């Protein structure tokens, strides 16, 4: 609760100043924009058949017929073409319609059949190559087979460079059922013919695709590895190249490895890392058959199935295919090799204590452990319970002699014989065992202090106690903590009146000295300029109310007019009108001004 501050105006006609409040508004932060990016679906590519040039390279220079040339045969199949008459005659082409002017007298029937046979042979070689090779194996550029045709073609800008396959980016290698748009080898394909009167088309490389691309999002390389089938063999010949794939390298599955323990080879380059994970693979799809690598398979590490270190067996899939460990591990003593199911240890057998005379029994562990051996065996709660049960049964079957007093709580041995034991803290001890926990002095017949079932002599117990921050003596009884220190209750007093502050509110000055509330206000409270007494809170209050005027402090009851003694306040005509440093009311202020004016006029 703050005190009122009453400051008198300098003149009666002076208006009271008004403090305007300024409200600052902090501009709110703009909402963040969210950009959502979606993955575009790849376009679907279809087989494209390039238009054939109008010029016929097989036409004689003096002939008049316009026949489209057949596609050039591949380089690999040029050796198979021996002569024109070596091919079987094609079926009649009565249903083929041509939109060009043909001169039947230009070529013989045998020449026409030879031209069609060459085209059929080219298509046959293409289909045979499609069935025997990987769809993503790059084909050798067949530029030599069309050099003669490109050299004699008039008005062309790009020569026919051969058959090129369509490259589909960002797709995984697929070795599956081929979906080809070409017809069977026994059916000739219709030949597209350019009509007369149109512009001459520019010849482009004849492109074809081995499989239709499904309209699916591109495969993500970072996918979970599918479990390969051990009996699956990839179609076609097995290439010898495997490893990391480059932009221009063919994809091939690795060859079969010997049945020895081998490491799993990643098909993609992998940088140095700290945790090995199986290489990413592609999920199996209905229309594609994935050719897995013939390597050893290992699932990713899961905490509940064992680790990859030498002390744990890796998790193996339960199948007829024998999977060998990916990493050779050294077996420890008493542990099954990795990959084999380790049966739990045999049931614990307990060796009973020997039946002897009342001889001191040694606490020993006669239980074989099923886990790994350790240098410091520790009792589990159930083992300790069984051990005590056996001891009790042994004591019941072998009652002690008349001099038996019990079992020592310190060493666990029997206390036998008169004068060899003592009783303390409701327990039995040997005389030699009942000693101080710090100085090991015998405590029989001596005063001791029991702390948590442990015995201490008086000097050692006192040394463990806290000391009072005032008298520096150990606190034997109740401890009073304040300001982070420990005190005796009678040492925690006010520095002014020396009264004990046990249970009484107190405060601390800047020097850390403890004061009661009254003495603190008497020492540090502001003084009234009229009565010179400290301005303290009213009885029962915690806050101090004072009046500040002319840079001076006043009690509420001491803020009065110096001439008439009237109580000043903030009411109308009751305020303070100071004059020459005096606290005056309005009436007394006017009277003093008139007296001073009259005196000045008489002096003149």
From Swiss-Prot:
The keyword Acyltransferase does not apply. PROSITE patterns: LIM_DOMAIN_1, LIM_DOMAIN_2. Residues 42-53, 143-161, 365-377 have a biased composition (Low complexity). Transmembrane segments: none annotated. One of its GO terms (biological process) is cell-cell adhesion. Residues 31-96, 129-381 are annotated as: Disordered. InterPro entries: Znf_LIM. GO terms for cellular component: cytoplasm; focal adhesion; nucleus; stress fiber. It is found in: Nucleus; Cytoplasm; Cell junction. The keyword Repeat applies. Keywords: Activator, Cell adhesion, Cell junction, Cytoplasm, LIM domain, Metal-binding, Nucleus, Repeat, Zinc. CDD domains: LIM1_TRIP6, LIM2_TRIP6, LIM3_TRIP6. GO terms for molecular function: metal ion binding. May play a structural role at sites of cell adhesion in maintaining cell shape and motility. May be involved in signal transduction from cell adhesion sites to the nucleus. Belongs to the zyxin/ajuba family. This is Lipoma-preferred partner homolog. It comes from Gallus gallus.
């Amino acid at each position: 609760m703050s005190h009122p501050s009453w400051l008198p105006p300098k003149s009666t006609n002076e208006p009271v100043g008004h403090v305007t409040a300024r409200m600052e508004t902090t501009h709110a932060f703009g909402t963040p924009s969210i950009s959502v990016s979606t993955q575009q679906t790849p376009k679907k590519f279809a087989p494209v058949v390039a238009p054939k040039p109008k010029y016929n390279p097989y036409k004689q220079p003096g002939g008049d017929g316009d026949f489209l040339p057949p596609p050039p045969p591949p380089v690999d199949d040029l050796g198979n073409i021996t002569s024109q008459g070596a091919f079987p005659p094609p079926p009649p082409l009565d249903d083929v319609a041509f939109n060009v002017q043909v001169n039947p007298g230009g070529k013989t029937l045998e020449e026409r059949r030879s031209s069609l046979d060459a085209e059929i042979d080219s298509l046959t070689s293409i289909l045979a190559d499609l069935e025997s090779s990987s769809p993503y194996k790059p084909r050798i550029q067949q530029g030599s087979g069309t050099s003669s045709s490109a050299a004699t073609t008039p008005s062309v800008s790009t020569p026919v460079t051969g058959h090129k396959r369509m490259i589909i980016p960002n797709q995984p290698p697929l070795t599956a059922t081929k979906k080809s748009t070409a017809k069977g080898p026994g059916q000739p394909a219709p030949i597209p013919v350019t009509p007369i009167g149109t512009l001459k088309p520019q010849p482009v490389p004849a492109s074809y695709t081995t499989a239709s691309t499904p309209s699916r999002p591109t495969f993500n390389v970072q996918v979970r590895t599918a479990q390969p089938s051990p009996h699956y063999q990839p179609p076609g010949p097995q290439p010898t190249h495997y490893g990391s794939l480059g932009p221009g390298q063919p994809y091939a599955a690795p060859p079969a490895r010997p049945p020895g323990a081998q490491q799993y080879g990643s098909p993609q380059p992998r940088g140095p890392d700290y945790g090995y994970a199986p290489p990413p693979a592609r999920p199996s799809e209905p229309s594609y058959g994935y050719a897995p690598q013939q390597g050893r398979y290992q699932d990713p590490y899961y905490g509940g199935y064992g680790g990859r270190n030498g002390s744990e067996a890796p998790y193996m899939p339960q199948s007829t295919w024998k999977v060998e460990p990916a990493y050779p591990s050294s077996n420890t003593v008493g542990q099954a090799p990795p990959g084999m199911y380790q049966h739990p240890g045999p049931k614990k057998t307990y060796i009973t204590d020997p039946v002897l005379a009342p001889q001191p029994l040694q606490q020993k562990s006669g239980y074989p452990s099923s886990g790994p051996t350790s240098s410091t065996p520790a009792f589990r709660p159930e083992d300790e319970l069984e051990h005590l049960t056996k001891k009790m049964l042994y004591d019941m079957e072998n009652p002690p002699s008349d001099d038996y007093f019990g079992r020592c709580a310190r060493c666990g041995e029997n206390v036998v014989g008169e004068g060899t034991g003592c009783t303390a803290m409701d327990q039995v001890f040997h005389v030699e065992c009942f000693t101080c926990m710090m100085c090991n002095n015998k405590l029989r017949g001596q005063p001791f202090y029991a702390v948590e079932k442990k015995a201490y002599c008086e000097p050692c117990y006192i040394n463990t106690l806290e000391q009072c921050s005032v008298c520096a003596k150990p606190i034997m009884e109740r401890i009073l903590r304040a300001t982070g220190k420990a005190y005796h209750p009678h040492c925690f007093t006010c520095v002014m009146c020396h009264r004990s502050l046990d249970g009484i509110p107190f405060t601390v000055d800047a020097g850390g000295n403890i004061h009661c509330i009254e003495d603190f206000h008497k020492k540090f409270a502001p003084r009234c300029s009229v009565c010179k007494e400290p301005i303290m809170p009213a009885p029962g209050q915690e806050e101090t109310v004072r009046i500040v005027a002319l840079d001076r402090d006043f009690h509420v009851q001491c803020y009065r007019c110096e001439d008439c003694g009237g109580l000043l306040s903030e009411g109308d005509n009751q305020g303070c009108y100071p004059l020459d440093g005096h606290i005056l009311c309005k009436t007394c202020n006017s009277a003093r001004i008139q007296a001073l004016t009259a005196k000045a006029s008489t002096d003149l």
